Structure formats: C-alpha cells, structure tokens
C-alpha cells in the first residue's frame, strides 16, 4: 500500500501506476532528497520533535541508501511513485519505526520544492563551470589570432575588415552575460521551502532558518503558499539556458559557414567532423550543426514549463510533476554543447590566407574612402555618394577599389590625393578603429584585458558557491 493509502479502500488502476509516477525522472535528485531529509531530521531532533537516537538512525540509514545508489546497488520500484516515497519506504524497511517519524512536519510539496531548488543550484553551477571553460578557450584563441584579419559582415555581405580576435571576443562577452544569467538563476533558487508543509505551514515548532542553513540556502521563502506552488526559479534556469543555446547556435552557424568550401576560413579537426556514407570527399561539420539544432530542444523545454505554469491556481497541483524533466534535459544538453564547442575551437585550424584573400574583395575599404573625403571637408552624405559611384564603376569593370587608377579617383572628386592608398590598405583600416571597443589591435588588447578581468571575477564568483549539493549519477 502507498504511504498515503490510509484514506483509500482500493489501489490505483494499473494503467495509472506508470502514468502517475515521477520516479524515472526525479530519481536523479536522490542526493538532494537525501540531503534535505537529513537536514529536516536534524532540525526535528534539535527542536525536540524526535529523539536524538531516531535522528541518528535516520541519518545513518539515509547515508547507507545514498551509498547504495551511488554504487548502482539500489533498485528503484515504480510502485513507490516518486523519489521521496522510494527513499522513505526503503529507510523504514532498514531502520523501522524511526523511519516513519522522518516525515513529521513535512509534506511532499515542500520536500519536492526543496529538492528541485537544490537541483537547480547544482545544475546552474555545472553550467557556470562549463561556461568558464569555453570562455578560456575563446580567450586563448583571441590571443593566438590577434593579428589575423577577416571580413566583417552585415546581411552576410562584406562590410568592413576586423581582427579575428575581435570577432571571437564578441562571443566571449555574450557568454560572460550568460554566466551572469546562470548566477541569477542560482540566486533565484537559493531560498528554502522546507517548513511550508503542504501549503499553510505546520503546527510543529520547526526552525526553518536552521534547516535552510544546513542545506546551504541563503534564507527561507517567507510565504508558505509561494514556497510550494511556484517554479519561476526553474524558468530562470530555462531562460538562461535558452540564451546560451542561442549564442551557441549563432557561433555554430559561423563555424558551418567558415568551414565550407565557399569560405574556407577554418578547417575542423577530424575529431570534430564526420564523413558521408556515399560521398568519399565529404568532411561535415555535423557537431556544429547538432549544437545549432539542439537550440530548438532547449527553447521547447522553456515553453513547455511556461505553458504548464500559466493556468495553475495556488497552491500545489500535480501538473508541477512535469517541471523537472525539461530542466534536466536542458542542463544535460547544454553541458554537452558547451564541451563540444570548446573542443571544436581549441582544435580547429585557421586558414589565415583564405581570410586575407577574402578581404581583397567586396570593397571593404569603401567606408574609409568615404571617411577620407569627409575628413577633407566634404559632407559625409556627399562622400558616400561619390564612393558609391566608384563602387558601381568597379562592379562594372570587375575590379576592386584599390585597382582603380588614381586618375579615376581624382575625376570623382578633386579632394582625392595620392595618399588615398592608405585608406585602401586593409591593415591600416583595421588599425584606425581605435575607439573603445573597436577592432584596432591596440583597442582589442585593452578589450582582451577587460575580458580576462571579467573572467577572473566570474571565477571568483564560481569559487564562492559552496555547500551546493552536487548532482548524483548513481541513478542513471
């Protein structure tokens, strides 16, 4: 009989047993559940609600169960319905009456909310670590390619030349903001629901602050209804994950393009490529494509929980059983994606010649030629028109701006002098972008220093995340 079966004369229908069980999913939170139960029992003993002997038996019994699960020696029974019932029933089987006292002053409603919050903290921390590792890889690549120039694009058309290091640092800053969002998700989960019981609190003299401190929470949730009924902290994790997936997808798209025959900017290592079953010549960027594809999966998990939550009245509803699978899937998916992305970048080969060659087409110097005229007194809009006419002439002749004779420039505007060649020189164009955040080598060096400082600060934040109940892997 189920632990809640006293009020019932018959068991649940066979067809609903598996349908209603959450154990296949929430068993992955076994460490969080056991840690929460230990803290609850310790508080019950401190408050004189259970004896010290019972608390010791409970703690030892739970430790034994955890060790068995860690070692893969624990059999989960679907009839136990969820991780809470599974562990409590096994605890009672092992230690007897003391196990039946564990649930005093507690409901599965505040218990599962606690497990989930502890789980979100653990998942956010894992993702933060993977985020830091990828940013290290991007930083190393930015240092390595700090003099390599490639075309910058708008609308996927040649725009202006930029340093490859500048391009890579753009993604580093995106992932730095992702770290901040992950920390915000961690903080959103960092309050303890235990003591809220089913929804209204309890008549037992529980010390909620003690339990929260034991579990490493920053504090307690001040409203018992809110404590058991909302999952906005999970949505914060989903949103942070969705933005990470979007940034990874954008970077993956560029890797797919850059590794193509049409671009040839990079060559992916064999370890991060696949072949074709029919075309012997193929070397496909499958893993970049998979990262791009998995972004939709991560977005779907966010939307699923939003839709699940949108119509729920206070307080707990069984719909909330659907809250964990998507979060676990998103975290697992992103951990893989972040790791694969770091591997791809750290092992690729940059084809500097192909990037330099592509800088010689597409009239990348056009803006600087217009600026040349504007700095000599011609209104920029007029300068823009003059250079636009020169570009049109180049298109008709099948040449680039730097191929035009000096006489053609003078015919277009008497303001052109022989030093126009400097405005047509790609390295000089890049070196001129000295504004803060610009692509000039000097500006990028400053930016790199700031990025390294931000990375170091985020590593300090990560190092401060103590007393986190790490995810267990014995239930896989």
What are these regions (language model features)?
Residues 117, 121-128, 132, 139, ...:
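Short amphipathic alpha-helical segments with heptad-repeat character
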Residues 1-32, 36, 97-98, 279-476:
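Glycine-rich cofactor/substrate-binding loops
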Residues 40, 61-68, 90, 94, ...:
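Generic, well-ordered alpha-helical scaffold segments in large soluble proteins
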């Amino acid at each position: 009989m189920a632990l809640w079966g006293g009020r019932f004369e018959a068991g649940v229908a066979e067809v609903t047993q598996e349908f209603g069980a959450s154990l296949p999913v929430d068993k992955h939170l076994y460490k969080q559940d056991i840690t929460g139960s230990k803290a609850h029992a310790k508080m019950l003993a401190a408050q004189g609600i259970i004896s010290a002997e019972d608390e010791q038996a409970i703690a030892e019994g739970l430790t034994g169960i955890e060790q068995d699960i860690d070692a893969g020696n624990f059999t989960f029974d679907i009839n136990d319905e969820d991780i809470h019932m599974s562990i409590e029933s096994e605890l009672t089987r092992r230690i007897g009456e003391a196990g039946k006292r564990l649930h005093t002053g507690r409901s599965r409603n505040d218990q599962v909310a606690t497990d989930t919050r502890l789980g979100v903290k653990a998942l956010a921390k894992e993702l933060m670590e993977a985020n830091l590792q990828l940013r290290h890889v991007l930083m190393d690549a930015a240092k390595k390619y700090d003099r390599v120039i490639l075309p910058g694009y708008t609308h996927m058309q040649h725009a202006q030349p930029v340093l490859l290091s500048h391009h890579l640092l753009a993604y580093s800053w995106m992932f730095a903001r992702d770290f901040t969002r992950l920390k915000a998700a961690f903080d959103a989960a960092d309050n303890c629901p235990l003591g809220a019981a089913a929804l209204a609190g309890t008549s037992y003299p529980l010390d909620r602050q003690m339990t929260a401190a034991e579990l490493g929470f920053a504090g307690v949730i001040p409203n018992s209804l809110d404590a058991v009924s909302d999952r906005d902290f999970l949505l914060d994790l989903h949103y942070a994950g969705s933005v990470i997936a979007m940034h990874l997808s954008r970077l993956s798209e560029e890797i797919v393009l850059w590794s193509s025959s049409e671009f040839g900017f990079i060559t992916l290592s064999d370890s991060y490529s696949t072949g074709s079953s029919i075309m012997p010549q193929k070397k496909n960027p499958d893993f970049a494509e998979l990262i791009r594809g998995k972004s939709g999966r991560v977005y779907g998990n966010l939307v699923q929980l939003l839709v699940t939550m949108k119509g729920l009245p206070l307080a707990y509803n069984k719909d909330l059983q659907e809250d964990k699978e998507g979060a676990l899937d998103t975290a697992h998916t992103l951990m893989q994606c972040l790791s694969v992305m770091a591997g791809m970048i750290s092992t690729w080969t940059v084809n500097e010649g192909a990037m330099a060659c592509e800088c010689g087409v597409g009239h990348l110097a056009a803006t600087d030629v217009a600026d040349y005229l504007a700095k000599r007194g011609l209104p920029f809009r007029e300068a823009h028109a003059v250079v636009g006419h020169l570009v049109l002439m180049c298109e008709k002749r099948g040449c680039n701006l730097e191929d035009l004779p000096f006489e053609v420039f003078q015919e277009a505007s008497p303001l052109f002098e022989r030093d126009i060649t400097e405005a047509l020189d790609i390295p000089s164009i890049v070196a001129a972008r000295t504004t803060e955040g610009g692509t000039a080598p000097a500006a990028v060096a400053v930016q790199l220093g700031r990025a390294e400082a931000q990375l170091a600060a985020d590593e300090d934040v990560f190092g401060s995340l103590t007393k986190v109940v790490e995810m267990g892997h014995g239930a896989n």
